[in-house]
């Protein structure tokens, strides 16, 4: 535990300045990355499929290929980038994302949270058209991913940038997902299976650029 706390402090110290606590939850800011100095704070499942590059004068970190060398033991997303040295139970995560290629109904990005190990974690699949395996909050618990929601709200992907927010309260069990509208969640659920764990971004099998990641939590 002391090692995790030390690594978290190192991760925070490498990005400055840090803003105040989240105004809604009073959680402290524990991580921030605009990728201007690289991507050393991220652990990815397949380094060959992630690229740090400049887009319109701005540095981003993104997925460059739909195919991936990572083959999860339980059916779940292939493209995963986890923040190094930071674990939280309760958190607010925000970031900007751009979908690079229109792949149809399951065009997506994913957010991973309360990640215990490669076979136990939550994630949200922000798929364009919801069904049982797209556009839902999922759980992977030593078995293929399973939807915890029955969301019917589509995700309006386009060629531009979008803002995503994930809010987790582990004591209440609540999970809320926001897309562009930061006041009204596009989907939500309650579950207490997993507590403190890692946080990440990525996709099931699509190409995305990510920027301006901020994580408040404890």
Roles of regions detected by a PLM:
Residues 35, 95, 160-170, 175-177:
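Short tryptophan-centered beta-strand motifs in secreted/extracellular beta-sheet-rich domains
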Residues 79-86, 150-156, 200:
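Beta-strand-rich interaction surfaces with strong enrichment in secreted/lumenal proteins
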Residues 187-212:
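Flexible glycan-contacting loops in extracellular carbohydrate-active proteins
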Residues 69-139:
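Secretory/extracellular carbohydrate-interaction modules
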Residues 39-69:
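Extracellular glycan-recognition surfaces and repeat-rich motifs
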Residues 142-163:
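Short, aromatic/His-centered strand-loop micro-motif at the edge of beta-sheets
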Residues 1-7:
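Bacterial N-terminal signal peptides that target proteins for export
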Residues 22-47:
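Extracellular carbohydrate-recognition regions
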